[in-house]
Amino acid sequence: MVDFYDELTYETNPFPETHPGNLAALGRLFGIQTTSPQQCRVLELGSATGGNLIPMAWHLPQSEFVGVELSAAQVDIGQRIVSTLELPNIRLEVGDILELDAARIGQFDYIIAHGVYSWVPPLVREKILQLTRDCLTPHGLAYISYNLLPGWRMRGSLRDLLLHATREVTGAAAKYNTAIAALERLQQALQGAAADSQHYVQKEITYLLAAHPSYLLHEYLAGENNAFLFSEFLADAGRHELQYVCETDLHTLFDTTLSQPAQTALADIEDPLQHEQWMDFVQMRAFRKSVLCRADLPLERAIDIDVFTAYFYSANLRLKGKENLNNTKPVLFLTADNNELSVTHPL
């Protein structure tokens, strides 16, 4: 797999949900006295070229960052960026997750594994959870993203197609071109299709045709691509003395994201984790970004709204219409996905 990465490095960008400031705030909502992002240690497994970790190191100079990546070519790119920026608080190193020694790398307040867990074999997944258990500080948090059942089965049909279409093709560029041709053929074949499942596939094809080549290759043509039920992930984490805290998309924990009939149907499920599992089935969810902590850490599952008064908030908003911001009338703003937010004090 590393040769494939070396041939076409994975495009890495900052993932805001993995930022220690975001993780720290989420932990506080559930009663965890998380370490200040201004002075913490962060480990990223599968850090690629450092596109996620380097901006954190730049903005949090008193914190320490360590990235571990299997591909020497990607680490070399990242190290050159670190050198150019003269960042003393980040270290990117070539390493195999299976060979990482928890005693050597030490403990971390925040551990990140984005786009790794579903794309490695079982032994590596076990080692990720083992390292998380052994390397987390007592109040530390880990972020792990993974493909999710049942929703991933729909996307998996496209993976089946692309693996079939490229089965006799070698080289990253040739595989990519062949995959694009296959997607375009299927897109043409589905014109005028009426089934909801076909509409879903059409939407995914449109996304993949516009995506960065590295995403298509590493997401859909990688040797490993596994999806799990939420309950399966919880069981695996539990075996390693880890427990689930929440999702980085906090709103997905609440049934207000469901239709009224769905809320009614699930209303008698008292266990919050079983309720989340059922929400996955109802929504056909395909991806999760889960936050874990040590199993011996007490959590406050009932979020107290007063906790929110201790935080500052920021959002990517745009003004709806041409409101006058010089008065105290509520003003409507739009989020990036066009949801409305009413603000009483817009300035």
For the regions a language model picked out, list residue spans one by one:
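Conserved SAM-binding strand-loop segment of SAM-dependent methyltransferases
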Residues: 86-97
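Rossmann-like AdoMet/SAM-dependent catalytic core
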Residues: 194-347
